[in-house]
Regions:
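Flexible inter-domain linker/hinge segments
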Residues: 1-12, 17, 172
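Glycine-rich phosphate-binding loops that contact phosphosugars or nucleotide phosphates
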Residues: 30-171
């Protein structure tokens, strides 16, 4: 519960996602018409949850790709594509390669990362730190939970910036 609190509470104000403390500009969310989530392992499963959240809430198409396959599939990326890289450590080699490809091809990039100053955090346009602390469980339950929360916050911000939900829907 503490990890979820640390991820969510500083970023919700009056029912709206607020990334100002993270220095994440609303501009990254403007005009997004497609989201690609890339990750490995547990983080990939959090991406699947995020896909359902975004598609159900705001009807933007989302694909979730294993980072190990992303760079080999020749993805179509442009300035209207938001690539979300999810990683606990911020150092996963395949996720870093996927991020670099997204950056090279002009996509907007944001990472959901636990470890401050990691390679993926440094190379992303923006980073949403989960502040989860070290993972004790082998099953990576804490990391999964906060990564899902991060995806929910991104969904809320996409909805708000692109006027895809009413204020009442946002507060629900």
């Amino acid at each position: 519960p503490e990890a979820l609190h640390n991820t969510i509470m500083p970023r919700i104000h009056n029912g709206h996602a607020d990334f100002s403390a993270d220095n994440i500009s609303d501009d990254i969310f403007k005009g997004v018409n497609r989201v690609i989530v890339t990750a490995c392992g547990t983080a990939w499963h959090a991406g699947l949850v995020g896909r359902h959240l975004i598609e159900a809430m705001i009807r933007i198409p989302v694909t979730v790709e294993l980072a190990s396959e992303f760079r080999y599939m020749n993805p179509i990326l442009d300035e209207h594509t938001l690539v979300v890289v999810i990683t606990q450590s911020g150092e996963t080699a395949d996720s870093l390669a996927a991020l670099r490809l997204a950056n090279e091809r002009g996509a907007k990039t944001i990472s959901i990362v636990n470890v401050k100053g990691s390679s993926i955090a440094r190379e992303s346009d923006y980073v949403l730190y989960t502040h989860a602390g070290p993972e004790i469980a082998v099953a990576s339950t804490k990391a999964f939970s906060v990564q899902c929360a991060g995806m929910y916050l991104i969904a809320l911000k996409l909805a708000e910036v692109n006027n895809l939900m009413t204020d009442e829907q946002m507060k629900d």
